[in-house]
């Protein structure tokens, strides 16, 4: 049987513990210190990039202010928070001032060219030096920017449960709301410095604009996919200047898809538009729509005969008579608008939506004057 034998006098017994555990600890400390140094370096780079975006916006005529700002997000994000954020748009027509509760912008350490931001409402719109005339609010508003200030690639803006009120003296008046609104833009061809081609997509879900037009009182879904061709570059500048460039270069706005749904009404359109030297739209979209007979009365019978021409006069007289004597028979006049066809299995009408010096006409029906883009 083995027995314990004490070590001889003057000889130290071997220790069962060692300093081996210190090595991984030191490695962890070095990694943590390196990560901290890297985070602060990345934070400085991110601050420079955010400053670059702000400078680009300033050169585009949009000036931003921030009452209180802070930096955080360690260890995996760089977060920039701005409390009581503001913006001045002196080049807008008319000039306006915006103010929001706060903005939180963030950049991931591993994805420094993607900037994400959330805007906390409400956001007020005012004439310079005047009380707010409109107030916008939402449950969520997000912006994403991909690329760098010198070479932007993509921008997106998304809101949920958005509302826009006009601040009347008595009480706010709702002028727009949407369950969801989206705006996306991206560089499709060319470069930022030479002949860029820009794709723009928008969408509205369950939107309404009671004061815009009687037809816009009821909720509708709307989506567009368009392409801008004719820009010289995408250097910082106001959008009216960009549209002027497109006109001078004989460029165009290619509407690749437009879709509108409201109740039984479904309309799709595509075509190409140009700009006149005065900034008005010029061109034609081919529209195919179902349920047209239900919206004709809302367009205003008095406007139907203003287009001139025998066909327009016949349509105006027919609708005027049918509207008074037999409202249910107004659908028979729809054939005067254009070619009868089908859309998604339903009976539809194909008709041109024309723009001439900004005046929009749907078939022979005059819709109204659109504003100039510059």
Regions found by a protein language model. Name each.
Residues 59-191, 258, 269:
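N-terminal beta-strand/beta-hairpin edge segment
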Residues 21-39:
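Hydrophobic membrane-insertion alpha-helices, especially the h-region
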Residues 41-58:
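Alpha-helical transmembrane signal-anchor/signal-peptide segments
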Residues 2-25, 67-68, 243-248, 258-260, ...:
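Extended terminal
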Residues 86-96, 123-134, 161-176, 206-217, ...:
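Flexible, membrane-facing loop/turn or short amphipathic-helix motifs
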Residues 79, 153-156, 196-201, 250-257:
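Short, hydrophobic/aromatic-rich segments at coil-to-beta transitions
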Residues 69-71, 100-110, 136-150, 173-193, ...:
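Extended lipid/amphipathic-ligand handling interfaces
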Residues 182, 200-204:
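Beta-strand-enriched cores of mature, soluble protein domains
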């Amino acid at each position: 049987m083995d027995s314990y034998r004490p070590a001889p006098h003057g000889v130290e017994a071997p220790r069962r513990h060692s300093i081996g555990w210190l090595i991984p600890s030191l490695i962890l400390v070095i990694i943590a210190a390196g990560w901290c140094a890297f985070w602060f370096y990345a934070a400085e780079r991110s601050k420079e990039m955010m400053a670059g975006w702000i400078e680009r916006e300033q050169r585009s005529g949009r000036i931003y202010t921030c009452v209180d700002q802070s930096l955080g997000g360690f260890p995996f994000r760089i977060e920039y928070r701005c409390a009581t954020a503001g913006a001045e748009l002196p080049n807008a027509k008319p000039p306006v001032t915006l103010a929001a509760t706060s903005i939180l912008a963030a950049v991931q350490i591993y994805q420094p060219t993607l900037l994400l931001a959330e805007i906390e409402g409400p956001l007020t719109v005012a004439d310079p030096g005047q009380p707010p005339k409109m107030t916008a609010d939402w449950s969520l508003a997000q912006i994403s920017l991909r690329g760098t200030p010198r070479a932007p690639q993509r921008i997106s803006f998304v809101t949920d449960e958005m509302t826009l009120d006009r601040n009347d003296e008595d009480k706010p008046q709702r002028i727009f709301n949407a369950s969801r609104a989206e705006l996306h833009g991206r560089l499709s061809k060319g470069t930022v410095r030479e002949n860029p081609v820009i794709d723009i997509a928008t969408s509205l879900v369950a939107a309404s604009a009671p004061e815009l037009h009687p037809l816009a009182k009821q909720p509708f879904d709307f989506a567009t996919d368009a392409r801008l061709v004719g820009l010289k570059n995408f250097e910082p500048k106001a959008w009216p200047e960009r549209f002027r460039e497109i006109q001078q270069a004989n460029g165009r706005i290619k509407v690749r898809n437009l879709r509108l749904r409201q109740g039984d009404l479904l309309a799709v359109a595509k075509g190409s538009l140009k700009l006149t030297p005065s900034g008005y739209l010029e061109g034609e979209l081919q529209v195919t729509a179902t349920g047209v007979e239900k919206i004709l009365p809302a367009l205003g019978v008095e406007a139907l005969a203003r287009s001139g021409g025998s066909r327009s006069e016949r349509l105006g007289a027919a609708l005027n008579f049918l509207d008074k004597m037999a409202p249910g028979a107004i659908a028979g006049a729809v054939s005067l608008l254009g070619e009868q066809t089908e859309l998604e299995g339903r009976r539809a009408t194909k008709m041109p939506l024309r723009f001439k010096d900004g005046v929009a006409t749907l078939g022979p029906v005059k819709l109204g004057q659109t504003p100039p883009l510059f």
